[in-house]
From Swiss-Prot:
Its main location: mitochondrion. GO terms for molecular function: aminoacyl-tRNA deacylase activity; ATP binding; valine-tRNA ligase activity. Residues 42-52 have a biased composition (Basic and acidic residues). The keyword Ligase applies. This is Valine--tRNA ligase, mitochondrial. Residues 1-15 form a transit peptide. Its EC number is 6.1.1.9. Belongs to the class-I aminoacyl-tRNA synthetase family. The gene is Vars2. It comes from Rattus norvegicus (Rat).
Amino acid sequence: MPHLPLASFRPPLWGLRPSWGLARPRALCTQPEPHGSPVSRRNREAKQKRLREKQAALEAGLAEKSKTPAVPTKAWSHKEVVLYEIPTRPGEKKDVSGPLPPAYSPQYVEAAWYQWWVREGFFKPEYQARLPQATGETFSMCIPPPNVTGSLHIGHALTVAIQDAFVRWHRMRGDRVLWIPGSDHAGIATQAVVEKQLWRERRVRRHELSREDFLRAVWQWKQEKGGEIYEQLCALGASLDWDRECFTMDAGSSAAVTEAFVRLYDLGLLYRNRQLVNWSCTLRSAISDIEVESRPLPGRTVLRLPGCPIPVSFGLLVSIAFPVDGDPGTEIVVGTTRPETLPGDVAVAVHPDDPRYTHLHGRQLRHPLTGQHLPLITDTTVQPHVGTGAVKVTPAHSPADAEMGTRHGLTPLSVIAEDGTMTSLCGDWLQGLHRFVAREKIMCTLRERGLFRGLQEHPMVLPICSRSGDVVEYLLKSQWFVRCQEMGDRAAKAVESGALELWPSFHQKSWQHWFAHIGDWCVSRQLWWGHQIPAYRVGGEKAEDDREECWVVGRSEAEARAAAAKQTGRPEAELTLERDPDVLDTWFSSALFPFSALGWPQETPDLARFYPLTLLETGSDLLTFWVGRMVMLGTQLTGQLPFSKVLLHSMVRDRQGRKMSKSLGNVLDPRDIISGQELQVLQAKLRDGNLDQGELAVAAAAQKKDFPYGIPECGTDALRFALCSHGILGGDLHLSVSEVLNYRHFCNKLWNALRFILRALGDDFVPQPAEKVTPSSPMDAWILSRLAFAANECERGFLSRELSLVTHTLYHFWLHNLCDVYLEAVKPVLSSAPCPPGPPQVLFSCADVGLRLLAPLMPFLAEELWQRLPPRQGGSMAPSICVAPYPSGHSLVSRGQESWRQPELEHCFSRVQEIVQALRALRATYQLTRARPHVLLQSSDPGEQGLVQPFLEPLGVLSHCGAVGFLPPGAAAPSGWALAPLGDTIKIYMELQGLVDPQSQLPRLAARRQKLQKQLDDLLNRTVSDGPAERQQRISSLQLELSKLDQAASHLQQLMEEAPDAREL
């Protein structure tokens, strides 16, 4: 489009005239009669009467309300639900031949589209390769497989919203896109939930069933919950290729897990050993670090734990005396928060440079319970300034003590059993007792023997099993471990070299720290649900203990038998093999997901075409537990990084800042926000879950506080837009339902805008090709420039992975540029006869391009509205907006390849908008609700006057004023006009004579001034909690408002003085 001089935009309908389209006499029909006339007097008296009646009714109502308890006001009102009721078979295209309903209704908009998208194959890479805009590039990504432990929550919805936005954008660009759906079997989590369900419904414990019967119950539960999760993904609009769906326990995944285990074992990267592991006594299984919740305790805290008959106090430091052998009266006092592990102590340690104990180096101490000799050892890891500077050493139940024990050759004593009771090594008096019951008995014994030296509150961090709520113990167990040092070094170097990009980049520090301190990974779990370990114990081989047992690994029992024969030198027929009953850590199979989902270990076409993945997007909390392990195993097993880019988003937390967790009961089902839900139903869902009574009470109370009136229906598009609108790459995301509701109102605004546009275009409108669209006015040029700017910003946001930039840009364009400005300004033009051809073409371009820009974020609403637009002349319209070309700034051009973007024009109009805001403020000050006063602008800068000149008519329309003209520089201010200076160069005059009643307005302004002055005085005379900058800003704002009121009062006083006396008339 040629960049014409601004003065050239002077078509008839946009020239300098008193009003849009038709000349208007000075006495406008919307103006009141002159002050003092009989009509004006009667109107004023009637108005005053109505105000008195209204005030009396209000006072009566307040008096009545004071007699009854106050009821909180609802924060939202129910919207009318419109349903799509045209018979449409699943997979058929929705009927859009009828008119749009009068208001936006999510249920109407979201009906039928998803099934049609899936049936048409729009989500398949094979379809996208045939698109006209096909780039030949590949974009592949996998969904972080959600656990089949229930329904998805808002944290999952955030992941889906972000991933689907990128997937849809790449698809519309023309890339060949594959987004792989899947779900995770979630070993411990699923087994724990099913065990609770079995007990609640059948009063049956897992060990009362056979392994086969229990697994049958889990598979049945999975079929129910797995389907629910996929329904949620569809409701969220996730454009996944469902033909490639996988589950981490299906046949293909099982084959991949077995192959990975065998290969790692053959390479010496997987071994069996007896080491300390995180142990859940309730689950009777080792658990992963991510399932250990570190709960800080400020001091004494009483907890009730599963399986423990008494409440237990934590956050207490117990001081215990260890007598020095052979030196009566000499003792070393040791502080501990774990007196129940005292029977497992094998030494006491002090720092070698601590002068308090130098004379006791090498001495023996007496165990306070058994009287056995314990060595006093010195170790530099002991902190002499903490407590007494002496610590007890329990290598079998503390990771730090285990390392110290290894350094000093100490033999560990396991005194806590798998079920959390005390072992036989503790003696008959403690054996079989629950460990925390034993704690109390040990304390009593210490008091009786005179070796108890005190009890004090002590801040501490308590490890809690997130799956059971029990305190995590550290137990010595024979388990399978993956050697991680070598693989971890490669993963660290991949980020350091730039081969693997982490975004935001600040996560690199956590990544490098984790791999620098990585230990071997315990991958075995004492469960029934999961991938059974493909390892076999060879029977008949002599072994002193489990550490000397003979184990072999194989893809099948036959392969394992052959390996056992080779290892033992015995014939296969004589061998007895017993398969390890344990299963693998869920994270092991999850770490294989990027390539097992594509068919690995088979050389499939999908693996060749889409691996490595283009991008991994997930929550920042999974950086090490999932992302790090995928990188380690992917690089080791495939020879390639599983992906080259990782995008980590913030965490969604509840009102108390806690992570969303099903065990806490603080999760929100996205469908409840999409469709709305009553409080009673929300509470019923909690009761139907697997929470114990304590958790249920806490969750129900929090839910009632957060949603006293339930949750309003917001729709999928509003939820997705709200989730993506946050700066997802920084701190935690605290999402409120009221925020989502605000974006539902934004959807309604879009809906009304398209209804207006479609009516304005009419049935016979034929849109021109985009390159033939040329503006016929400055306003046309401005909105097209804003549209091109929006396209540029959206592209920049997607490329820079800042979806909040995309949402902000689209919200601003649709609401503030198109709806608030252009549509209002163009209404008089569209209603004129004949209507110029330019504005309808511009309107169509705004709708077409604007909806395509919006489609990755609001797919349902964009599809519903875009399908109703007529196809462009001479072009083949895409069957769906989700495969239509995504606009970019450089693609929005007119004839001659001139860009729609005109920054200079936008700068000019920004000045016009400032004038509009000043005029609206003036109208509000003088309460000119219906009158359309004339306006004069006086500028000392001729250049600035030339910039504003082309926009005089839309300026009047947007400010709700009448004719707008210019007052020559230096000319005297007109009498009876209000003044609003705008900077140093422009003065704005607005007509007041005959439009306002000074006698009624002056008291109102005086009351308003008195109120603001009181606020200012209070602010100046009191100390506030706000910072100095906020306080000064508030003071300046009040002072400016007071100045404006004084100026308005002065103008009104001048009007009264200049007005003729009624007695002279």
